[in-house]
Amino acid sequence: MKNVLIATLGESPAVVTEALDVLKNRGIPIHEVVLLTTIDSAAEESLNLLTGHLSAAGIGVHPVQVEAYKDIDTDEAVMEFMEVACNQLRDMQKRGWDVYVSVAGGRKTMSALMTLAVQIYGAKELFHIIVDDPDLEEKSRIENLMYLREEEQEEILHPDISKIKFVSMPFIGLFPWISDIVKALKGEATDRKEIKELLSSNGLIEDNKPTSLGKRFLDILGRVESMPEPCPEEPEIKLSRKEPKYKEDIEKMANKIKRRFSFVCEIRDADWRRGEPKVKVEHPDRIKVYFPSGKGYNLSLILRTTAKTRGQLEAAKSEVERFMEREKL
């Protein structure tokens, strides 16, 4: 069984290492850490520091950035972060992993949305980390931490376990009833009367129709649930082009796609023909992606996915198109 920590991350990377230390002290070794961040510069510095620190300790790091947003302060950013969080939890539930979720880092909005995502898709444990030491808390901010020597960073990232308060938070995971919730939001019949009562009491449906808030919620769940299953193995990147002018750009994009889409099992480079769309499906399970390099030549990748139906493949294509649009490609 694989143990995974999902953590929201802002300008204090120590909340992640403190969570790992407490879990380890409880006999729960974490094999992989998923870090949810924005593209804010402080969050990126925190991510860089943690990636190096945790990788050196043999812990896998999987960064998931909410592209195009420096903060979660608009309706669009809220929708994007919520979908990303739900996707991560859904994929790990499908894989049968034990998921521990920390909401100690990042903006308050990120913590609130992550908590809501856990209410929907569940987790092994949801918790908050508190260190009752103002001086240590100030030192652990990335703007102070990044300029310290490695041994000084180590002391701040891993304080005495007795200083760390681990606050477990209760929740009720609705994952087993997701399909009924989606049906009810669509106004379709469901055998569970209590689901409609729950959605109605929370302002998500009215007169058997979704409210404006319910439509937004349905939009998120609809996209998450329509995605193909996560790839059971680590995705393979097979690139044939060796020319230096291609190699760096195409490797960068391949790795970004690998991190972003769990339904991708293999990534290959390919030729692009003039007049082709930027994203197109190639049945039964492939998506071809074209992106301009900005250096006078064209690059293309073929993504082999886990899609089993045309609907799943089209849903995956739509997600790739949204990604390309946000990347301004």
Where are the model-predicted features located?
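Conformationally flexible catalytic loops at phosphate/diphosphate-handling active centers
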Residues: 101
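Long, low-complexity, Lys/Arg-enriched
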Residues: 1-98, 115-329
